[in-house]
């Protein structure tokens, strides 16, 4: 397999992207459009048949019956074959095909670089291909001669580059002015109007002829992959792993409170436990109700009423019911209640033992009064019933 058939030359849109050569004063070899030349559409061949170079329409079909394979190469192999040292028609490798056509192998020459695999598996991705061709194009002899002269003289090439930059700036200004004057008259049907109302003109250039030829007709589309049996295959895999490691995504690392290591250069606000750095949570709703301090006597009476309802209260619950500042509420709580530290009612307040006794005595006294009232009412009811029975037992006599 030679380099000419392995890599297809790039296609060039020759008919649409072309310029004309300026008649005088052009030492750079670049093609410019002079003011004296007539501007015409190089794509409109029917109306400008006599003005187009005949060479630009010639297509070499000598190798049109030649069958070529369109191959997709790995990046490292394509870069090696793209080197100019490998583009002199020398043999790059051989293709080995089994008799039944089940396996196709590409073998590179042994004298090539040992850093890449020499054995590849070639897979047919599309066996039958229609209407695909490979083209090549070259400059005509007069343009090739100018190119060789510039390559032979570096100083002349440098002057040509500087001259090219100056002429490009001048050419842009002249072309813009010329288009505004002439293009509207000659190509009214080619003028387009943008949304902002300004006219936009399609650029018209003169076609530069190229020597175009068909390299061959594509008959198969293939893909080349390194063979796992090749000893250099593991080198390619290792290179890819290193590329992946170097291109890792950025990670977010949270700061820990390790004294003298990660937090040594941070401020006091970052080191304290109250820091909100990287903390996720909902913001607390701000209460618009302001707490007004009540007299201690009223708070104590209200606390006794609350402890009559439930024996155990949390500080949060008492604060919601009393609506007092926490410091003021704690000061009053410490006088009548104690905080439970263990058990099922841990971290809740309950009345002190002495107040519990008074509470029980008051409850018993209240229950005793209720019992006496119930007993007195029961005696009155019994006496009334006895008097009613006596009245029933007295016999009444009729007086005549």
UniProtKB/Swiss-Prot annotation:
Ranges of Acidic residues composition bias in the record: 33-47, 386-400
Phosphoserine: modified positions: 28, 34, 56
Segments of this protein annotated with the region Disordered: 1-47, 165-194, 366-400
Residue spans of biased composition, Polar residues class: 1-19
UniProt record similarity statement: Belongs to the TFIIF beta subunit family.
Biological role stated in the UniProt entry: TFIIF is a general transcription initiation factor that binds to RNA polymerase II. Its functions include the recruitment of RNA polymerase II to the promoter bound DNA-TBP-TFIIB complex, decreasing the affinity of RNA polymerase II for non-specific DNA, allowing for the subsequent recruitment of TFIIE and TFIIH, and facilitating RNA polymerase II elongation.
Protein name stated in the entry: Transcription initiation factor IIF subunit beta
Gene transcribed to yield this protein: TFG2
């Amino acid at each position: 397999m030679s380099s000419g058939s392995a890599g297809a030359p790039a296609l060039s849109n020759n008919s649409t992207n072309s310029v004309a050569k300026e008649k005088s004063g052009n030492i750079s070899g670049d093609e410019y459009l002079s003011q004296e030349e007539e501007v015409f559409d190089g794509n409109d061949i029917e109306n400008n048949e006599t003005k187009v170079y005949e060479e630009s329409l010639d297509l070499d079909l000598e190798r049109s019956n030649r069958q070529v394979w369109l191959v997709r190469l790995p990046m490292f192999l394509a870069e090696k074959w793209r080197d100019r040292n490998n583009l002199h028609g020398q043999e790059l490798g051989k293709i080995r095909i089994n008799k039944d056509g089940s396996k196709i192998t590409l073998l590179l020459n042994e004298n090539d670089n040992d850093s890449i695999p020499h054995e590849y598996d070639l897979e047919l991705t599309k066996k039958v291909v229609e209407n695909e061709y490979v083209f090549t194009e070259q400059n005509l002899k007069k343009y090739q001669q100018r190119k060789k002269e510039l390559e032979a003289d570096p100083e002349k090439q440098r002057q040509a580059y500087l001259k090219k930059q100056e002429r490009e700036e001048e050419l842009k200004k002249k072309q813009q002015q010329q288009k505004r004057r002439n293009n509207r008259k000659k190509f009214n049907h080619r003028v387009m109007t943008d949304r902002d109302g300004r006219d936009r003109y399609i650029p018209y250039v003169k076609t530069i002829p190229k020597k175009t030829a068909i390299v061959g007709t594509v008959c198969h589309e293939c893909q080349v992959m390194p063979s796992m049996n090749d000893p250099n295959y593991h080198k390619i895999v290792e290179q890819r792993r290193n590329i992946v490691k170097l291109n890792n995504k950025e990670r977010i690392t949270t700061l820990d409170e390790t004294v003298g290591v990660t937090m040594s250069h941070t401020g006091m606000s970052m080191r304290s436990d109250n820091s909100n750095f990287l903390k996720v949570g909902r913001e607390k709703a701000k209460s618009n109700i302001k707490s007004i301090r009540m007299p201690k006597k009223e708070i104590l009476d209200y606390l006794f009423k609350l402890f009559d309802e439930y024996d155990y209260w949390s500080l949060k619950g008492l604060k919601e019911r009393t609506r007092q500042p926490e410091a003021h509420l704690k000061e009053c709580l410490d006088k009548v209640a104690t905080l439970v530290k263990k058990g099922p009612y841990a971290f809740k307040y309950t009345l002190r033992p002495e107040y519990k006794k008074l509470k029980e005595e008051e409850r018993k006294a209240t229950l005793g009064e209720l019992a006496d009232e119930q007993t007195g009412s029961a005696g009155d009811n019994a006496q009334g019933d006895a008097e009613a029975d006596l009245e029933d037992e007295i016999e009444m006599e009729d007086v005549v």
